[in-house]
Amino acid sequence: MASYDLVERLNNTFRQIELELQALQQALSDCRLLAGRVFELPAIGKDAEHDPLATIPVVQHIGKTALARALRHYSHLFIQQQSENRSSKAAVRLPGAICLQVTAAEQQDLLARIQHINALKATFEKIVTVDSGLPPTARFEWVHRHLPGLITLSAYRTLTPLVDPSTIRFGWANKHVIKNLTRDQVLMMLEKSLQAPRAVPPWTREQWQSKLEREYQDIAALPQRARLKIKRPVKVQPIARVWYAGEQKQVQYACPSPLIALMSGSRGVSVPDIGELLNYDADNVQYRYKPEAQSLRLLIPRLHLWLASE
């Protein structure tokens, strides 16, 4: 059970995040808007969080409307702030960018504010995921007991400032989470599950235990040097590719929230060129580079565990 002191830290850290976000919103509102472009994505309905998305239609908002939506989005932390038909398990995404004219001093002040907010968000995430000592299944209940309706992913998400970018382009990224494992590491994972028997619907406790035992035996029968990997697909994500002319470099950013471009004009760029995010269509994805697929055999579907050929 998490201590009273930890609960107090959880609440205090979150209140600081809220206050700092309010102050940042005001500071950003006081700046002159040079350009704004954000892309509204369809709402994810309840029980549809894990459904694969073949298409994602995009609705564009520009100018002052984009700025207003961006500022609201940064503080969208609770399910009470959204439609009751929208999933409470999927954080709202609003890719795009707002570009603001600032002096060098204002730029440094805003960068410091954003850095402080991101540090508070990291502290909040650590309190929930590490300091609480709770397993993932218990964290949700604990957090929502103290902060009812909180969308935890939105609370964790950091803000991304850009310093005098030249161009901002948007696109979609299809990715997999890949983790290489040894046979013995997988056996240890399965052993832990075997030592904590439970029912996992639709299976009874005994059926689940039997299933785990079969999985353990299948892995134990592999050679010790077998090459195993967890390869789990991640939902398609909006990304931004930002070009900095002064440094002659391109940086790719995840873009679940509007990027904050702070334009001081000190690097010869007055207003960056902001591109458009096109609708996503899984059947027409064009890959810049697609490496040759490795030969894999699926061993345990629920873990996305694969055996790589020698």
Swiss-Prot record:
Keyword Amino-acid biosynthesis tagged: no
Predominant location: cytoplasm
MF-aspect GO terms: DNA binding
Gene Ontology CC: cytoplasm
Keyword Cytoplasm belongs to the record: yes
Family under the similarity heading: Belongs to the Tus family.
Record NCBIfam families: rep_term_tus (TIGR02648)
Function: Trans-acting protein required for termination of DNA replication. Binds to DNA replication terminator sequences (terA to terF) to prevent the passage of replication forks. The termination efficiency will be affected by the affinity of this protein for the terminator sequence.
Record protein name field: DNA replication terminus site-binding protein
Species of origin: Klebsiella pneumoniae subsp. ozaenae
Organism lineage: Bacteria, Pseudomonadati, Pseudomonadota, Gammaproteobacteria, Enterobacterales
Gene: tus
